[in-house]
Amino acid sequence: MVSQLFEEKAKAVNELPTKPSTDELLELYALYKQATVGDNDKEKPGIFNMKDRYKWEAWENLKGKSQEDAEKEYIALVDQLIAKYSS
């Protein structure tokens, strides 16, 4: 179960005045999934579904990371993005 702070950061990232880069969004997605679900157990998307494939690969790269560590890293990343895009 994720913390209240994690849930607040997940909302805050959607309210940034500037959209994060594609790489930042992939990292956010992967950390969010690892924190909320755990290791990726989904089937790898087909080669022609590039967007979902990139998301799947980003999440897959976190396999073995604890949900608690992923949550902490997600919160830290959101804080960095808030500082970067809100200034």
From Swiss-Prot:
An acyl-CoA binds at residues 29-33, 51, 55, 74. There is a cross-link at residues 51, 72 (Glycyl lysine isopeptide (Lys-Gly) (interchain with G-Cter in ubiquitin)). GO terms for cellular component: cytoplasm; cytosol; extracellular region; nucleus. GO terms for molecular function: long-chain fatty acyl-CoA binding. Residues 2-87 form the ACB domain. Keywords: Isopeptide bond, Lipid-binding, Transport, Ubl conjugation. It comes from the Eukaryota. GO terms for biological process: fatty acid metabolic process; very long-chain fatty acid biosynthetic process. It holds the Pfam family ACBP. Binds medium- and long-chain acyl-CoA esters with very high affinity and may function as an intracellular carrier of acyl-CoA esters. Enhances the in vitro activity of the ceramide synthase complex. Belongs to the ACBP family. Present with 8500 molecules/cell in log phase SD medium. This is Acyl-CoA-binding protein.
